[in-house]
Amino acid sequence: MGKILGIDLGTTNSCMAVMEGGEAVVIPNAEGARTTPSVVGFSKKGEKLVGQVAKRQAISNPENTVYSIKRHMGEPNYKVTLQGKHNTPQEISAMILQKLKADAEAYLGEEIKQAVITVPAYFNDAQRQATKDAGTIAGLEVLRIINEPTAASLAYGLDKGEVEQTILVYDLGGGTFDVSILEIGGGVFEVKATSGDTHLGGDDFDQRIVNYLLAEFKKTEGIDLSKDRAVLQRLTDAAEKAKIELSGVASTNINLPFLTVGPDGEPKHLDIDLTRAQFQKMTEDLLEKTLVSMRQALSDAKLTPNDIDKVILIGGATRMPAVVELVENFTGKKPYKNINPDEAVAIGAAIQAGVLGGEVKDILLLDVTPLTLGIETLGGIATPLIPRNTTIPTRKSQIFSTAADNQPSVEIHVLQGERGIASENKTLGRFTLDGIPPAPRGVPQIEVTFDIDANGILHVSAKDLGTGREQSISIQKPGGLTDAEIERMIKDAELHAEEDRKRKEEVETRNNAETLINAAEKTLKEAGDVATEDQKSKVNAAIDDLKKALEGKDAEEIKAKTEALQEAIYPISTAMYQKAAQQAQQAAGGAAGRTDAKGPEETVVDAIMR
């Protein structure tokens, strides 16, 4: 079996590693560097450039250079135009992967066909699928997609030999942020919770400096540079350099001569001092966002900062002193610094590749799904099948039914999110199961199965248990959650929890009432002489009362009338059951030991159908 490449496909930089002699080794690229800028461009002569060479020519050729494409993975309508050709994020990412693959092959002297690629823990299904597709386009069989914080913990835990540790992994990369809580012990790496923001990273810190420089230049020179792409590229490069320098010094000078020309043709230069204190002040809200995610992850894991044994920082942006201070103050632990934050994820990916290839033994990786998955049911309710932070791979099935008599099909509306109301969540996909035989509502049994594979990619199927007819969908729909959508899902779930609970309870109360009315009317038709006229009259009156209550909006009134109908129908149902039992015994001829009693019925939830 050939080498399996471990790849950290980053927003700003990418890194690769393989297992050699039982150890994960970082592979340098063709230029000799251990990381490769995630930049793609085309020279003015039409030559494709990837990595450092693409980054170097960006200032003079910004319109044909692409940065931070990872931020757009999974977006359906996002295209990048290079040399007149429209490219998807998958295609741009594939160009980066192709360079990594070629450089690894040159270094190892053998062909690379397979890879393990990492993604942010908070990447949704569409973003994960897009990453896998990029690998396929690059000529790689992607054996596994794993979360970056989990990969970093593998890099940390492989040679430590310690057991039963709770680890917080804080991953602030170029364009994404994740925090994960893991328990490590006995070779098992189990993710307990994860939280984050797929649109927060070092790029955002750079942009704050760029905005500051633009404002200062406009204030002193009266010139707006925000529309000049070449100037913006120079400012972005200078901002990144200043950010890095401020990790080691208290103040830095940003000097960009001949930045532009004034109305009189005179050259204009930029010369500004920036202190670490100024930089931290202009970015404190970004750091606060990461603090919110840390609190969320600990809450989901049902832990406190005191329960954390070790803290790992990964991603180049964690070199900023303010980040280190924030994490240390929150957890009360000094971050573990014996891992290169730029290389830890690739090393972990290589270790996972070693597990898959049989080179690494006695390691079990248990990752989680970041958001709740479910379907829409009658009344617009979001019915969860797989809660967030469930260990993957996982499979869950639940029985649903029809919402109307003689319903020929059901639509399965697949959702992702934390709200109790379907319309407040993210739609992942829809599909229809046809060919359901005519039957009263609630009778057909439709088994809906959610299956999340080890890559975190969801597959959904629906099966009519009566006919065996089945329909399925792999959720590979392009498009994904924005950072605002992800943050809104968690925050809205907390802010509107009581409102959702009441709305859900009201819908369920109505559903139960309508179901009981149908059952009661059916029972009356089948009762025959088992029920007295007085009993039938009471049931009909109770049905009328409940129908009238359903015309209003008083949930308590509906509940009361539902209970009244249950009490009215109970004597008839009991008498019918006893009669059926007597007939069954007579049909059995009194044979000893023989029974025809039914087993317990399965709970059926009505599925919404459009």
From Swiss-Prot:
Pfam families assigned: HSP70 (PF00012)
Name assigned to this protein: Chaperone protein DnaK
Keyword field: ATP-binding, Chaperone, Nucleotide-binding
Role, per record: Acts as a chaperone.
Family: Belongs to the heat shock protein 70 family.
Species classification: Archaea, Methanobacteriati, Methanobacteriota, Stenosarchaea group, Methanomicrobia
NCBIfam families associated with the record: PRK00290.1, prok_dnaK
GO MF annotation, one: ATP-dependent protein folding chaperone
Domain of life (superkingdom): Archaea
Origin species: Methanosarcina thermophila
